[in-house]
Amino acid sequence: MSLLEVFYSLYKKRWNDITDAIIQEMGAPKDFASKLQTGTGASHTKSFIRYLKEFEFEKPLGDHAKNQRIIYEPKGVCALITPWNWPINQVTLKVIPALASGCTMILKPSELAPLSAMIIAELIDEAKFPKGVFNLVNGDGEITGDALTSHPDVNMISF
């Protein structure tokens, strides 16, 4: 949880950089890019942190089976593919839960809008998440997307 909080703090510090990247990627007006795009990513991140502080990753099955447990475990390697039109929104909706649940992930942003995802990669690195947990690949959907979605070591695909 503390790494996500560090990430969130760094995200807010790089707000203008993220906004500028979105303007370049989408041609979005500055207010739209800042408030709705960058702001949405911040809001999602903050909401996930708040939710995860209360989430029980292990709990009893129920009153009828007190010795049996429900244990939420990482899914494994996740391939996360995001579109160009909501770059930060989709990145945070995919990356933050994967980080929080302990999954290793490969993020492939749209080839039309990779800049904001590159900043997210920098923030994850700066927050000191373990090396190899987050991986960023750039490329087109036909080649890179196909490689990710057909790889036998990928346990989950989010598109």
Where are these regions (language model features)?
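Rossmann-like NAD(P) dinucleotide-binding subdomain of oxidoreductase/dehydrogenase enzymes
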Residues: 57-159
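N-terminal Rossmann-like NAD(P)+-binding subdomain of aldehyde/semialdehyde dehydrogenases
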Residues: 1-66
